[in-house]
Amino acid sequence: MTKNNGITIIAFDAGRTTGWALYHGETLLRFGQFTVADATDVTACIGYILDGRDGWPRDKAGPRHPALAIVEEHAPWYQRSHEGQVGENRIKTSMDVNIKCRRRLEAALLRCGIPSLGVTPAEWGAGRYVLADVLAELARAGIAEPENFRIPAREHQRDAIVLGGKMARRRVWEVR
């Protein structure tokens, strides 16, 4: 999300039909039913899989890259957690799993030298991981607000990042 001070901020929502990630170098990775695009300059790619039905689409994922391993490892675990779950039970399971994922990912972020984004587990699990949280954390770290983001028109969303989960999908931003 920003190159300032060499810090990489990553946020993406990977679902059954769409998922996006931005990483250091301003290159986009596309997940879900899309292929991975231009994964050659990955510094770190950290995220979580929201879709428990499809999991990680190995046959559609495109070229592998070592930095993708931490994302890939969550899919089977998350998918198993959803077996037999419907309605509110499934939602609760989703939140529980996302909280566990968040803790593992926070540790991975720190190992990569990336600070915590300061989002509580409840907010993470509820899909409220939004741009305002990211920008607030950047400001606390003394990093200027990125200037290359804007809300895109609907036809441009194929080149966008979704910051947030299924409950925050309207917060879509595009790299200029």
Predicted regions and their residues:
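Phosphate- and other anionic-substrate recognition elements at nucleic-acid/protein interfaces
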Residues: M1-R176
